């Protein structure tokens, strides 16, 4: 599970291309630099207000409170899952759009959760103390146990009112406990029809300006009533002025800027090509399947757009990594860093062998990468039904263990969110499940080989489509 962080970026309009580069966590915002450069005093009070007005949707999106009674503004694609789960053959909200005339007309999104970061504590020193003088293998187990204890202590201190998550920054350079207020009742208030919300489709995606109504409105509820949210962002109809600093808060995904050259080459030579080969073909099968029936088209329309978005991202990542000048620049940056480490005896003693250790770990990783991808990461066993079955089986086994010894996704702190996702009343299209499972089993057999013990164990004498049926 990716831990998503609250970060803040600054743009200087009118040209985003002229924006200052970089994102900062709320605890590390460079207020002095911003004041010097833009003559804007970003106070701690302002940062706290922005933090409390920013929401995290548990499907990986960011939103903002836009009213004192729980209204949340987010991107249109962030509500596609909700829209798909609420739609039927008779009422397709994707093509019709949705507007709730009153709060009573708002529709609950199955399994959707929304969180607000209300506090955080750096625990780097505590983790360092818990793992001191240990081998890496033992330190890894001790680290997991310590983070689990800290999560549990955080939740106990709030009498169960808050959800706490351990967050790792900079590949272990810092550790935090993030404390969230979580809303388990999230309802759809407004969404444009897909033809407007994603106007231009894949060709227009990542082109700016883009002429689409890329927004939806949700509402957070508590105890069956709209949540009281006094910290919200006010609407300014006039919009930003040319040259005016604009600050953006959100819960972004991860970046790969800190990867070593060897890790970037692994992405270039192994991970990205394999991903693109698989998902480009899966997209093609979805495109063909959507024409088999109106229901098939409704089921995969938004998913196709999601895959096209991901394919475009990874295709351009690969294009960048195939650029010799880019790799040469990263190699130069790494060389400068290694020379700086070597020049400091203390740093050399602690980190001088880091790059060699990374190289060796990548060699080991390469030896089992495909098996891990197709088996553990379910690249060969796709679909909601398999994912739910795996969660139930593994969750049962993990809950028999002490909390500190469990896989992190099954700790007491993680279970409420896991259970809500697992038991949400989401419709499952059996024909689409067959399509996904058939495809993934075929790819598993193709990449691992028909004589792989894993393939023989899973398929036996069955063909992928027969087993999926």
Regions found by a protein language model. Give the residues of each.
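Terminal presequence/propeptide segments associated with secretion/organelle targeting
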Residues: 2, 9, 15-469
């Amino acid at each position: 599970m990716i831990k998503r962080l609250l970060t803040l970026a600054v743009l200087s309009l009118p040209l985003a291309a002229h924006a200052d580069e970089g994102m900062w966590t709320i605890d590390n915002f460079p207020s002095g630099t911003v004041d010097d450069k833009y003559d804007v005093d970003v106070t701690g009070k302002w940062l706290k207000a922005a933090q409390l007005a920013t929401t995290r949707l548990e499907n990986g999106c960011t939103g903002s409170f836009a009213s004192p009674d729980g209204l949340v503004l987010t991107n249109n694609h962030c509500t596609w899952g909700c829209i798909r789960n609420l739609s039927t053959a008779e009422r397709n909200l994707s093509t019709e759009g949705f507007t709730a005339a009153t709060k009573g007309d708002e529709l609950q999104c199955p399994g959707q959760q929304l969180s607000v970061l209300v506090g955080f504590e750096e625990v780097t020193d505590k983790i360092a103390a818990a793992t001191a003088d240990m081998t890496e293998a033992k330190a890894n187990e001790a680290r997991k146990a310590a983070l689990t204890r800290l999560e549990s202590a955080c939740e106990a201190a709030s009498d169960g009112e808050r959800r706490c998550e351990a967050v790792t920054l900079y590949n272990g350079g810092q550790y935090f406990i993030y404390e969230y207020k979580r809303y388990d009742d999230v309802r759809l208030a407004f969404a444009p029809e897909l033809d407007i919300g994603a106007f231009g489709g894949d060709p227009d995606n990542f082109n700016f300006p883009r002429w689409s109504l890329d927004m939806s409105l949700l509402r957070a509820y508590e105890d069956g009533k709209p949540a009281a949210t006094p910290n919200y962002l006010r609407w300014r109809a006039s919009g930003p002025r040319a040259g005016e600093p604009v600050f953006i808060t959100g819960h972004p995904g991860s970046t790969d800027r800190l990867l070593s050259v060897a890790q970037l080459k692994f992405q270039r030579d192994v991970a990205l090509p394999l991903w693109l080969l698989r998902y480009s073909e899966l997209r093609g099968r979805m495109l063909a399947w959507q024409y088999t029936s109106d229901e098939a088209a409704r089921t995969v329309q938004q998913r196709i757009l999601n895959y096209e978005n991901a394919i475009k991202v990874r295709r351009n990542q690969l294009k960048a990594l195939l650029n010799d000048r880019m790799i040469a620049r990263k190699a130069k940056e790494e060389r400068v860093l290694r020379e700086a480490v070597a020049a400091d005896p203390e740093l050399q003693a602690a980190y001088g062998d880091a790059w060699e250790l990374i190289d060796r770990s990548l060699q080991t990783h390469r030896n089992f990468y495909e098996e891990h991808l197709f088996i553990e990461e379910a690249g060969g066993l796709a679909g909601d039904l398999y994912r739910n079955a795996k969660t139930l089986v593994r969750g049962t086994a993990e809950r028999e263990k002490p909390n500190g010894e469990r896989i992190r996704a099954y700790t007491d702190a993680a279970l409420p969110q896991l259970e809500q996702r697992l038991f949400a009343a989401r419709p499952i299209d059996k024909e689409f499940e067959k399509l996904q499972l058939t495809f993934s089993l075929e790819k598993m057999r193709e990449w691992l080989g028909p004589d792989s013990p894993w393939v023989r164990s899973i398929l036996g004498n069955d063909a992928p489509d027969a087993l999926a049926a």
